[in-house]
Every structure is written in structure tokens, then in C-alpha cells.
Design a protein with these regions (language model features):
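N-terminal signal-anchor module of multipass membrane proteins
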Residues: 1-52, 275-279, 287
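Membrane helical hairpin/interfacial module
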Residues: 20-27, 39-95
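Long, contiguous internal "core" modules enriched in hydrophobic/ aromatic residues
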Residues: 5, 11-15, 32-37, 78-80, ...
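Cytosolic, membrane-interface loops and tails of multi-pass inner-membrane proteins
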Residues: 66-77, 202-221, 276-289
Length: 289
């Protein structure tokens, strides 16, 4: 399970990057009217998203056996989810970086910036979809479930909502944006709660209703039950912190801590995901052998 750390780092960082862009950066940069504080906060969120995705892309090369052969990966767009994933990853990275450059050089949501933001949002959404499609394999039934795309989406949504709420709560986005912190805190609470409920009930191999019943060539999933308990504890702690902010507590420190706990829980969950029985993703089977 631990040998899959490059895939764990890639998926968590990439999904968080898309979520931070869609939920934290996009609303601030696309907002009408000149607001230097909101623009600055939006650029910070966008830079964090681009940096996380660039790091995720670099980490993905650690996973492959022959990185130089990765140039072949775009040759199978019609049949391979991996090819589509890489295409949309590169498109999202380029479009998000171009949008950031446009927002920095030309303040205000002009036509060019709006178009770049919309295109980057579409590419990011398709990137997440392609990432989930890689695991839709009949030979890996524990991964080929609705929880896989849902958990990927919840990682993106939770990270993005928590980042957006924190930027507003700490005043980085300006007083006008700070006044709209509440909906993002509520969205954070719902996202973390949904992740916790899914992990407890339907996470393959560990959820209450999806525990393995057939023998496997790999060690039983119960050997990693401690990590699942840690994951649930991290999500419960994050949920408690966000709940405290909803109840009126000051959010700057609590939301930052909740974001860290949520990312840690997502990382633990991804290690459990890759520890399930089944073939490795096609990235290490078809293109780089």
C-alpha cells in the first residue's frame, strides 16, 4: 500500500488544486468591479492551485517505470482515460496559469480573463472526470464503484470550500468578500460531513456496507483498519472545527486547521483506496513498461 505514495500524492494534490481553483479562486477573480483585495486573494488561491498541480504532475513521474516513454501517453485519446487525464491536466494547468497572468497584468474581469477562467473550469472538471474514469475497471470491482468519482469530487469540493472560507475569514479577500464567508463555511461543513459519511458507510473495503467477503491475494483489508480509524478521527475533528465556526467561533485558525485535517484524512483514505485488491492503474501497465 505505501509503495503507491506517488499516486496518493498526485490524486490528492490534483483534486485539491481543481477544487481550490473552482471554489476559492474563480469567484474572487470573476467578480465584477475593481476590488484589489479580492483580486489579490484570488491570485493567491490560483497560484496555490497551479503550484499544487505542477507538483502533482512532477510526482506522477515518480510512479512510472520509464518516464521518458510518457511522451506516448497522448496517443490514445480515443480509448484511454489516462490519455484524457493527462490532456485535461495539461490544459487546466496552462489555462489556469494564463488566467492568473491575465488577472495580474490586467485587473478586472475583462472578456479575456472571463474566457480563460471558464475554459480552465471546464478543463479542471474534465480532468477530475478522466481521473475517476481510469478506475472504472471490471477487474477491480472494489474501485469500480460510484464512491470512487464521488470521493474524488468531495476531496476537490472540501479542499476548495475550506480554502475559500479561510481566505474570507482571515480578511485576505477584503471586507466585501468577508461578509460572504458564511455560505462557504456551510459548504465546507456539508463537504466534510459527506466525506465522513461516505467513508464510514460505503468506502470500498472499509465502509460498513462494503467490507470484503471474498478471499484476496493481498493481505486482508482489516490489517489497515487502524488507518481507517485515523481517517475517521481526522474527518470528525475537521467537522467539529468547522461546526464551531458555524456556531460563531473565530474562523481564521480553526478553518486553517480544518483544511489541514481534511487533506490528511483524504491522504489516508487514498492510501486505503490503493491498498485494495486489484490491478494497478493503466498508467503503469500500458505505456511505461
Amino acid at each position: 500500500m505505501l509503495k503507491e505514495w506517488p499516486l496518493v500524492a498526485f490524486t490528492v494534490a490534483a483534486q485539491s488544486a481543481v477544487g481550490v481553483f473552482l471554489v476559492a479562486a474563480l469567484p474572487l477573480l470573476a467578480a465584477p468591479g475593481p476590488d484589489p483585495a479580492a483580486r489579490r486573494a484570488g491570485l493567491i488561491a490560483l497560484a496555490a492551485a497551479v503550484g499544487a498541480l505542477a507538483a502533482a504532475a512532477a510526482l506522477s513521474f515518480v510512479h512510472v517505470r520509464h518516464p521518458w516513454r510518457a511522451r506516448r501517453v497522448l496517443a490514445n485519446l480515443g480509448t484511454s482515460w489516462l490519455s484524457r487525464e493527462i490532456l485535461f491536466e495539461l490544459a487546466f494547468l496552462a489555462l489556469a496559469a494564463a488566467a492568473g497572468l491575465s488577472a495580474w497584468l490586467r485587473p478586472g474581469a475583462g472578456g479575456l480573463l472571463t474566457g480563460l477562467l471558464a475554459a480552465a473550469a471546464l478543463a479542471g472538471t474534465l480532468f477530475l472526470t478522466s481521473m475517476a474514469g481510469i478506475y472504472a475497471l471490471a477487474t477491480a470491482p472494489f474501485r469500480d464503484r460510484a464512491w470512487t468519482p464521488l470521493s474524488f469530487a468531495l476531496t476537490a469540493l472540501g479542499a476548495g470550500a475550506l480554502a475559500a472560507a479561510w481566505l474570507r475569514a482571515c480578511g485576505a479577500a477584503g471586507p466585501s468578500a468577508a461578509a460572504g464567508t458564511g455560505p462557504f463555511v456551510l459548504l465546507s461543513f456539508v463537504s466534510v460531513a459527506a466525506e465522513a459519511a461516505g467513508a464510514f458507510l460505503v468506502a470500498p473495503g472499509y465502509g460498513l456496507f462494503l467490507r470484503p467477503t471474498a478471499p484476496s491475494l493481498r493481505p486482508p483489508a482489516e490489517r489497515h483498519s487502524t488507518l481507517h480509524v485515523i481517517r475517521m478521527a481526522l474527518l470528525a475533528a475537521a467537522l467539529a472545527l468547522v461546526g464551531a465556526v458555524l456556531a460563531g467561533a473565530e474562523g481564521r485558525t480553526l478553518l486553517a486547521a480544518a483544511l489541514g485535517l481534511f487533506i490528511a484524512a483524504a491522504t489516508a483514505g487514498r492510501f486505503l483506496f490503493y491498498g485494495l485488491a486489484g490491478p494497478r492503474p493503466e498508467s503503469s501497465l500500458r505505456y511505461f513498461a
